[in-house]
């Protein structure tokens, strides 16, 4: 039993005793002053008891309200924990990293803010969906580069995408021109090999021909000869070389660089052209487009 309850019981017992004494005085002749004193004492005791009971009730109400507030604060803390679980660490490679430092996750994002974070070396960037106003997509994300690993980004997603516009990474096609030796035709020919690989998106496909130290290697092509009738309807016919080489022309091993070298060759044939005319003819062939094939 609590101390407050014991005090209330004692007050009520004392009031009961005073009421009994007042009753006895009324049965017997007694002075009016003594009766008034007993009545005032009884009223005082009951007032004290009522005050104690009301105080305990207010105290219990206050205690319950504090318990409810504590539960609410715990629930808020749990909600924060749940929201923080929607976090993922994404490893970003150079090939997929965008110029603005964000990552390509298949959605269209627009950066709307950046903030310095206390205790962190890198700022935190804030992005919203590009279709926020056109399609009412409320998805947002926060991107921050890791302090320990520059290629690691911590991304926090808030909300889900409701838009229907999802981007997909584009691929570019590289064309490498190299000199190869083949036994199918009479001479050596230039083959174009196509390689597709995931790279940073570009607007158009490129034909890349890397020529290193061209001025120092003009002697490589001193026996090349061409005539106008050999190029017809976008087809490069087989006679690319006239005469036989002592050593075969080895193919280029690097992706798009021409590094082959001829060790020895016979005397130049009639109407042979220099390396400059060879490359001008090669440019004309490349201008035909990507659909030219060997006949």
Curated annotation (Swiss-Prot):
Phosphorylated and destabilized by ASK7/BIN2. One of its GO terms (biological process) is regulation of brassinosteroid mediated signaling pathway. It comes from the Eukaryota. SMART domains: WRKY. Induction: Up-regulated by drought, salt and hydrogen peroxide treatments. Induced by salicylic acid (SA). Up-regulated by E.amylovora. Triggered by P.syringae. InterPro entries: WRKY_dom, WRKY_dom_sf, WRKY_plant. The keyword Transcription applies. Disruption phenotype: Decreased tolerance to dehydration and salt stress. Increase in the number of necrotic leaves and in the intensity of necrosis in response to E.amylovora. Increased susceptibility to P.syringae associated with reduced PR1 induction in double mutants wrky46 wrky70 and wrky46 wrky53, and triple mutant wrky46 wrky70 wrky53. In these mutants, higher induction of PDF1.2 upon jasmonic acid (MeJA) treatment. The triple mutant wrky46 wrky54 wrky70 has defects in brassinosteroid (BR)-regulated growth and is more tolerant to drought stress. Transcription factor involved in the regulation of osmotic stress responses and stomatal movement. Interacts specifically with the W box (5'-(T)TGAC[CT]-3'), a frequently occurring elicitor-responsive cis-acting element. Positive regulator of EDS1-dependent defense against E.amylovora. Together with WRKY70 and WRKY53, promotes resistance to P.syringae, probably by enhancing salicylic acid (SA)- dependent genes. Contributes to the suppression of jasmonic acid (MeJA)-induced expression of PDF1.2. This is Probable WRKY transcription factor 46. The gene is WRKY46.
